[in-house]
Each structure stands twice: as C-alpha cells, then as structure tokens.
C-alpha cells in the first residue's frame, strides 16, 4: 500500500521518517559535467540541505538541478485532451511531490487553498541527455515507478540521478551531501571547502543521528 508521507507519524504526532531505499554511493571522482541531476523541493528540509551543499561547493554549473512544486498533489491524475488515447489513472488516495508543467502554473492545495505561482520555464527541463526524446513525468511517484516498477514508496526527494545510466543513485540526503562534498571536486568552484572535515566527523555524525 502506498501512503502519503504525512501519514508517517508516531502516536504522539511526530513525523517518523521512513528509511531511504536507494543507497548507492558515488565511488569514483566525477568530472563529467551534468551527468548527474539533483531533484529537490524547496519545501523539504532534507532536500534543501543538499541544495545548500551544492551551492556552497559551487556545483551549480556541474550538476543539473530540478525543482518540484512545493505543494503536494494527488499523484494519480485524469488524462488531458492530449492523452485521450490513454486510460485514466485510478486515484488511490496518494498525494506527494509533482513536477510543474506549462499548463498548470497555479496548483491548488488539496485543502482547496491555492498555492503561490511557480514559474515553470526557469527550472523545468527534464530532457533525455542524448537529446533524442523528452520523457514526461507527472509526479515523483511516476519517476520512481518508471525506474523500478516494483517500488512501493515512499516517493521522496531529494533524488540524486545518473542521467547517463538512467538510474536513481541515492535518495538519502545525509549520503548525498557527503558525496557532493567529496566526489565532484573537478566540477566544484569551491573545491577546497570541506564541509565534512576529519576533525569534526564524529561530532557531525552524532548530530545527524
């Protein structure tokens, strides 16, 4: 069963974060520009800490960034006029992150309250790295299921994605930020900045727990 992340709370109402499922690490030093993409939401603190590290290291020209809409929506949708030959997806009640699109600049909150306008063209690319086709995903859920059709969730950000091998590398923010800190040095404008110094690692690890 697929649950909206807001349902992952303990008996006292505290958010109980699920274990991340994609835990591969970047083992080699990366020098290939825009091979990797970081998918984040400005409304997710785990995603924004990855984005902060990316900018602190000066990796914004070496790693592509894609921003999902900050307001959760149903992840199953009715088909539009352009999709009239496709079957309508069944609404199973799940809500989560969705990609902005050119036809819906205003996205309504599930409660009926409209969210802020989100400019699409500035952020939304989602193109095949070989430039031979454009793959459209409506939601982060679609993105996960496209890459692993047996995956049941949670459908979270951040996501570190390998655009060459077309695979989700990692969706655990604490591991992503360490790889951003150490594995992309040839692409980093601030390569000498070490955000995980040996002398502070024990303290950082304890705080992270």
Model-derived features: positions:
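GST-like domain detector, emphasizing the conserved glutathione-binding G-site
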Residues: 1-209
């Amino acid at each position: 069963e697929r649950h909206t992340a807001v349902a992952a709370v303990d008996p006292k109402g505290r958010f109980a974060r699920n274990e991340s499922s994609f835990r591969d690490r970047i083992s080699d030093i990366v020098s290939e520009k825009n091979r990797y993409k970081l998918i984040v939401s400005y409304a997710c603190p785990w995603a924004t800490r990855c984005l902060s590290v990316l900018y602190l290291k000066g990796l914004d020209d070496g790693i592509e960034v894609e921003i999902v809409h900050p307001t959760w929506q149903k992840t199953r949708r009715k088909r539009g006029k352009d999709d009239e030959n496709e079957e309508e997806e069944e609404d199973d009640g799940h809500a989560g992150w969705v990609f902005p699109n050119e036809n819906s600049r205003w996205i309504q909150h599930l409660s009926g309250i409209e969210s802020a306008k989100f400019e699409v063209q500035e952020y939304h690319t989602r193109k095949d790295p070989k430039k031979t086709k454009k793959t459209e995903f409506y939601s982060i859920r679609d993105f996960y299921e496209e890459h692993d059709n047996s995956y049941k969730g949670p459908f979270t950000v951040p996501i570190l994605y390998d655009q060459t091998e077309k695979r989700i590398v990692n969706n655990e923010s604490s591991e992503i930020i360490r790889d951003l800190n150490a594995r992309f040095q040839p692409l980093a404008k601030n390569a000498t900045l070490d955000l995980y110094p040996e002398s502070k690692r024990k303290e950082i690890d304890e705080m992270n727990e």
